[in-house]
Amino acid sequence: MSVALFCGPPPAVSFGCKDGRGRKGMVRSKDIVRQTVKPPAHACRLIGWNKYPGSVVPTNSSLSPSPTALDDEIELDLSPFLIIYKDGRIERLKGTTVIPACPEVATKDVIIDPATGVSVRLYLPNVVDLPSKKLPVLVYFHGGGFVIENTGSPNYHNYLTLLAAKSGLLIVSVNYRLAPEHPIPASFDDCMAGFNWVVSHSAGPAPEPWLARHGDLTQILISGDSAGGTVTHYVLLRADAGVIEGAALVHPYFLGSKRLENQTEEDFEFHEKLWRLSTPDTEGLDDPLINPLAPGAPSLAGLKCKRAVVFVAELDFLVERGRMYYDALVKSGWGGEAELVHQKGVGHVFHLSDYSGDVSVDMMAKMVAFLRGE
């Protein structure tokens, strides 16, 4: 097990989505990973949407492009997330850096499904003083639009290290497969598998000693931000009754076919394009996987938890969808306790890159209080 010290937030990066300006002013991350994996056929068909400025690099048919020029031809541009080139490369522009598992709390990675490569990263707070104490368990699903990020991303690793230290919970972060190489529902299936893997430790031999020795499996909570919030809802509908104590949905990535007043046309079209790339068999933005309030979607009365909190941010493209979800949950006849936390002056997942600001500190305090049941 590798050991390191939690060093605070990563260097600030200018991402428009974090300050309410959409994608304006975006800069590319320096940590670019080029993957020589041919994307699925559906990803290439999306080039028909050539109404987005800059999404395709035109070529001169009268010239024979050099290998270098061909390498740079773009099939589909989904900045600031990823770019797909005509030669099959996928270039992820952010969310690719991986830092080793490390404690201030103890951390380690465990592969839970060798066939798919799905793994989890565990965060165990200091239990030296109380070695026999059982800790509530939080299963966490990271965000990234289903196409970027991982459990080793600096933002997520640092945030969950801090959350484990402050809350005293044993955290299990699920590293699911990403689209477009692994189209949805792969990510949903992987997260459900990660959740079930944790639950399995309550019945019979436990393969993971940290969970067996230190996890209170009568106190399981789940949470996720952005796309991870979408997955959290998915798991809540499919878990066995009585297993999940509470759920925290942070800036959940819920969409819909109707553009809301706070959503620009540019952002709306971008996220529709991203969803169709990730989910080739989708019927659109009213797919119940991404729109829990769509006609035919399962009733929110069926959520399998006792308590739920929904965090929304004033400058977030998704703020109204989050509020609508909360309102629908309250009116659904669901028998649990629901809470809405609306934070002003901040944008989407601001808390992952700013730990010291007043709003971030307040959000952490509210999250810790919820997880502890205070």
UniProtKB/Swiss-Prot annotation:
Mind listing the UniProt keywords for this protein, alphabetically?
Answer: Amyloplast, Lyase, Plant defense, Plastid, Transit peptide
What's the short name of a Pfam family annotated to this entry? Answer: Abhydrolase_3
Q: Which tissues express it?
A: Highly expressed in pistil and bulb scales. Lower expression in stem, and barely detected in root, leaf, petal and stamen.
Which Cys-Cys disulphide bridges does the record give? none
Q: Which GO terms describe its cellular component?
A: amyloplast
Catalytic activity, per the record? Answer: 6-tuliposide A = tulipalin A + D-glucose
Give the stretch annotated as transit peptide in the record, renumbered to this chain. 1-68
Per its UniProt entry, which superkingdom is the organism in?
Eukaryota
Instruction: Specify the enzyme's EC class, one word.
Output: lyase
**Matching InterPro entries:** AB_hydrolase_3 (IPR013094), AB_hydrolase_fold (IPR029058), Carboxylest/Gibb_receptor (IPR050466)
**Molecular function in Gene Ontology:** hydrolase activity; lyase activity
Q: What is its main location?
A: plastid
Q: Name one GO biological process term.
A: defense response
Does this UniProt record's set of keywords contain NADP? no
Q: What is its EC number?
A: 4.2.99.22
Please tell me whether the keyword Lyase is annotated for this protein.
yes
Active site (UniProt) = S226, D316, H348
Q: Where in the cell is it found?
A: Plastid, Amyloplast
The extra comment attached to this record reads: 6-tuliposide A and tuliposide A-converting enzyme, which are compartmentalized in the vacuoles and plastids respectively, come into contact with each other for the enzyme reaction releasing toxic tulipalin A upon cell disruption by pathogen infection or herbivore predation.
As for family, the record states: Belongs to the AB hydrolase superfamily.
Summarize the protein's role. Answer: Lactone-forming carboxylesterases, specifically catalyzing intramolecular transesterification, but not hydrolysis. Involved in the biosynthesis of tulipalins, defensive chemicals that show antimicrobial activities against a broad range of strains of bacteria and fungi. Substrates are 6-tuliposide A > 6-tuliposide B.
Q: How does it assemble?
A: Homodimer.
- What is the protein's name according to its record? Tuliposide A-converting enzyme b2, amyloplastic
**Organism name:** Tulipa gesneriana
- Designated gene of the protein: TCEA-B2
